[in-house]
């Protein structure tokens, strides 16, 4: 199954459908239909906003129609799913649920979770509301104290201000099956800020945090505003030995179908030295792009590790 716990307007699932369409283009009509059904039935998409859920459902139907994967006028044929069947599956698998305080609607956890969680603090969420202060305190308290059925606290990495993206990172790892992959688009501040230390410890010490792509403040991406943007890659429940940090990246470093170009700047953080020079805070250093400055920074890091 593929999941997005804050599906928004459905941008990620649209991209997945387009990749799916490209990859099945050479198959028989029956194989295309069966593969498309399998993909739709494996979707696990939720959002706490009814508006977002309605938008995502409509987007998925429109994309399926444009890709020629559904029969708009009938009950389907050898190569296409009927519209009524597609809409029924989509309605069942795109739901309005609070992923932070609610229960996941599916028994089987996802093996792949890709999302861009909201970059908000609780106090920003209710800014301007006449009862904002009371609402903020109430939600913050519920999130801090929320317990699972076995008595465990759901969010163990809360520290300082309650930032929603931190909660979504921790929750995403809980939702996935052991060995499942999580990729999240988050602010770069999570890599270094002190208040994210408990979350980084969780990423490194209880999971395999193996990659991060970092784009600086002037990234020219369509999201992120003036903040640095990072994409973290985690395998749930495994062991972190080496984190490969790519960056600072530019738009030209992104390669369609490959991820990043082969000469994108990167360096590797080995667990032992990394723990030593960060005093087990697992902070990821902000690197210069210049080859000379980069070499100096890496040399300094090596000395700290020694």
Q: Model-predicted segments: where are they?
A:
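Flexible phosphate/Mg2+-sensing switch loops adjacent to catalytic phosphate-binding sites
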Residues: 19-42, 63-88
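Conserved SAM-binding motif I beta-strand of class I
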Residues: 43-47
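Signature of N6-adenine DNA methyltransferases within the class I
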Residues: 7-14, 21, 48, 53-54, ...
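Conserved class I S-adenosyl-L-methionine
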Residues: 2-6
């Amino acid at each position: 199954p593929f999941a997005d716990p804050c599906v928004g307007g459905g941008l990620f699932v649209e991209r997945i459908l387009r990749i799916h369409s490209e990859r099945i283009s050479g198959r028989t009509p029956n194989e295309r239909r069966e593969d498309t059904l399998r993909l739709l039935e494996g979707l696990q998409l939720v959002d706490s906003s009814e508006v977002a859920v309605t938008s995502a459902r409509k987007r998925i139907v429109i994309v399926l129609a444009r890709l020629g994967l559904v029969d708009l006028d009938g009950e389907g044929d050898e190569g296409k799913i009927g519209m009524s069947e597609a809409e029924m599956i989509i309605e069942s698998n795109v739901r309005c649920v609070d992923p932070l305080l609610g229960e996941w609607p599916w028994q089987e956890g996802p093996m792949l979770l890709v999302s861009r969680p909201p970059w908000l603090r609780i106090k920003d969420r209710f800014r301007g509301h006449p009862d904002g202060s009371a609402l903020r305190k109430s939600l913050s308290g519920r999130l801090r104290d929320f317990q699972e059925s076995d008595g465990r606290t759901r969010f163990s990495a809360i520290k300082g201000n309650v930032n929603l993206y931190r909660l979504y990172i921790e929750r995403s790892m809980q939702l996935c099956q052991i060995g499942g992959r999580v990729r999240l688009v988050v602010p770069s501040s999570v890599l270094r800020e002190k208040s994210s230390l408990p979350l980084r410890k969780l990423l490194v010490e209880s999971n395999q945090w193996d990659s991060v792509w970092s784009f600086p403040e002037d990234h020219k991406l369509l999201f992120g505003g003036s903040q640095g943007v990072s994409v973290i890659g985690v395998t749930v429940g495994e062991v972190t030995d080496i984190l490969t940090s790519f960056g600072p990246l530019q738009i030209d470093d992104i390669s369609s179908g490959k991820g990043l170009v082969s000469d994108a700047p990167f360096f590797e953080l080995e667990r032992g030295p990394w723990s030593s020079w960060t005093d087990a805070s697992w902070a990821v250093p902000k690197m210069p792009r210049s080859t000379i400055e980069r070499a100096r920074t890496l040399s300094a890091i090596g000395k700290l590790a020694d």
